[in-house]
Amino acid sequence: MKKAKGIAKSVAVASVIMSGSLGIQATSAFADSKGTVENLQNGGKVYNSFKTTYDMKQNIKNSIKVSFIEDPYADKKIAIVTTDGSNIDAKYTINSGYYNAGLKWPSAYHTEAEITSSDSAQFHKAAPVNTMTSAKVTSEVGYTLGGSVKVGVNDKGPNADASITGSFAWKESVSYDQVDYKTVLETHTDKKLNWKVGFQSFNFPEWGIYNRDSFNTFYGNQLFMKSRSYNEGTNNFVSKDTVPALTGYGFSPNVVAVITADKTESTSDLKITNRRISDQYNIEWVSSKWWGTNNKDTYNEFFTNNYKLDWKNHQVTLDNQKALEEQMIGINNVNNQLNKGKGKLSFSMNGDQLKATSSNAGYGISYEDENWGIFVNGEKVYTFNEKTTVGNISNDINKLNIKGPYIEIKQI
């Protein structure tokens, strides 16, 4: 590779330019679909309710279908939740450079479900379960009047069907593709579920099979390295059309959760998060050859929605008030931690916008060299140091017009 006059270094995390009134926010939209009703034999009914939201900044779509089963023979209320229609973009992003360059790529996707109300609602069953390594994962749920729920998941390759048998009053099947990734249900309790779909390996025809930990004495990790000794940095990554589809383009999770509740319940609270964990793969020109390193779990970006399950009216609705309440709990905890020096800095929410106020503006929070980050849906948008004057910090934050509802402030 020919030498250049200057050496361009890759930057893993972009900094924020603080000028004007730049807005940093979770730009989202939502859509309602009219519900449908299915009549079951012997008197039962299934009420289907849909909700779709989209976060533009993270390019994540949360879509859920809730099937409320009205069964006169069951002693519980039952809802089947699927994430059919959801999508998490890969954000396969190259950081330009000549002698140094970086690639942000998704090493794992998560779909998380949590019942946040302190009522009788609980996760009765879920699918898929255990570890799924097939290229296509198909889950099936069947319901028999009287409250019997059966779920099944394929484990026999990309063309296999989910394996539940029997006579059912109602049945549904969902699936997703995960070539070169595998599914693990990491959390499976009565109130929380967490599916992880993690990267396994990539078979690049030029060099062979590589994973996140691959190492070569001469070239380091060649995971997404196109050439060992040619190309400028920016052009020396494997294209998104060559890597696995989940790596280059994104993932469409489609999982199943069965929720039961006492007959006396009127509403329950549900939270769904779709998350993207990304590594930073860097290459550096060293001694006439490329050297690759893979930094794990560098980015944690997500999109969360709070929902209200209306058992009486068989509807799922967005619960924005719940999201703001959770937001304020976190902000109040941060305010308590920052209230320790002469310079006072505190945060509040004005609607969905983060506001900062200060007193003794010419002083810092402390004399300690401690950094804090402000994150929106997991993406860092601002950093401040405890030694910086609180007046400058609050002015910067208010100019940025940071909007939630999922804002996190934490030490970094």
Provide a role label for each language-model segment.
Residues 266-282, 392-411:
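Short, aromatic- and glycine-rich surface loops/edge beta-strands on solvent-exposed regions
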Residues 281-333, 410:
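Short beta-strand elements
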Residues 180-233:
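Amphipathic, membrane-active segments
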Residues 131-187, 226-295:
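Membrane-insertion modules used to breach or fuse lipid bilayers
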Residues 34-144, 183, 201-208:
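Deployable pore-forming modules of oligomeric membrane-permeabilizing proteins
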Residues 378-389:
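Solvent-exposed serine/threonine-rich low-complexity stretches and specific carbohydrate-binding patches
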Residues 1-11:
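Bacterial Sec-dependent N-terminal signal peptides
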Residues 20-41:
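Sec-dependent signal peptide cleavage junction
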